[in-house]
């Protein structure tokens, strides 16, 4: 069973575009992780291994276009290749939802990105749903409910 500690989306310029923490940490610990990992991963060459060790856990990352998807995982429990597959499935799901997702989609629609992520990964960092079709169905239902709620507010 996969147990994620955190997921970060970082641009090539080193700006955090999205972060989700699945393990309780102090603000200082979170800031240190971001501060340490961002330049380390950005400096790595494309042909280098996508798995690095950091303190007490492993970090798996993958670059898609101008974004780095960085995942911290528990070393004893997790499978690094499964974590890479989770990253890929997350990107595929966003790509289907947004239609060729880009960094601006994530910036301007971050709440939808969090919805997709929350449908895929539970709050403790374990996988909730791996089917892209199911995740998209749930997010679409949420969109419909949200638009109906907004319509009711306008009409009342």
UniProtKB/Swiss-Prot annotation:
Keywords: Cytoplasm, Cytoplasmic vesicle, Endosome, Golgi apparatus, Membrane, Nucleus, Protein transport, Transport. Pfam families: Clat_adaptor_s. GO terms for molecular function: clathrin adaptor activity. InterPro entries: AP1_sigma (IPR044733), AP_complex_ssu (IPR016635), AP_mu_sigma_su (IPR022775), Clathrin_sm-chain_CS (IPR000804), Longin-like_dom_sf (IPR011012). GO terms for cellular component: AP-1 adaptor complex; cytosol; endosome; intracellular membrane-bounded organelle; nucleus. It is found in: Cytoplasm; Nucleus; Cytoplasmic vesicle, Clathrin-coated vesicle membrane; Endosome. GO terms for biological process: Golgi to vacuole transport; intracellular protein transport; vesicle targeting, trans-Golgi to endosome; vesicle-mediated transport. Gene3D superfamilies: 3.30.450.60. Belongs to the adaptor complexes small subunit family. Component of the adapter complexes which link clathrin to receptors in coated vesicles. Clathrin-associated protein complexes are believed to interact with the cytoplasmic tails of membrane proteins, leading to their selection and concentration. AP19 is probably a subunit of the Golgi membrane adapter. Component of the AP-1-related (AP-1R) complex, an adapter protein complex that mediates sorting of cargo SNARE SNC1. In contrast to the APM1-containing AP-1 complex, AP-1R is incapable of sorting CHS3. Present with 6370 molecules/cell in log phase SD medium. Adapter protein complex 1 (AP-1) is a heterotetramer composed of two large adaptins (gamma-type subunit APL4 and beta-type subunit APL2), a medium adaptin (mu-type subunit APM1) and a small adaptin (sigma-type subunit APS1). AP-1 interacts with clathrin. Also a component of the AP-1R complex composed of at least APM2, APL4 and APS1. This is AP-1 complex subunit sigma-1. It comes from Saccharomyces cerevisiae (strain ATCC 204508 / S288c) (Baker's yeast).
């Amino acid at each position: 069973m996969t147990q994620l500690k955190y997921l970060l989306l970082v641009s090539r310029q080193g700006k955090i575009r999205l972060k989700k923490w699945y393990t309780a940490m102090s603000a200082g610990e979170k800031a240190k992780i971001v501060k340490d990992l961002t330049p380390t991963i950005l400096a790595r060459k494309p042909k280098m291994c996508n798995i690095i060790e950091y303190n007490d856990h492993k970090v798996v990352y993958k670059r898609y276009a101008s974004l780095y998807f960085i995942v911290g995982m528990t070393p004893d429990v997790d499978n690094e290749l499964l974590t890479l597959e989770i990253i890929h499935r997350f990107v595929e799901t966003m790509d289907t939802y947004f239609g060729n997702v880009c960094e601006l989609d994530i910036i301007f629609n971050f709440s939808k990105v969090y919805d997709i992520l929350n449908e895929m990964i539970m709050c403790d960092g374990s996988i909730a749903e791996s089917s892209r079709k199911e995740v998209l169905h749930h997010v679409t239902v949420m969109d419909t409910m949200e638009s109906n709620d907004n319509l009711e507010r306008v009409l009342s």
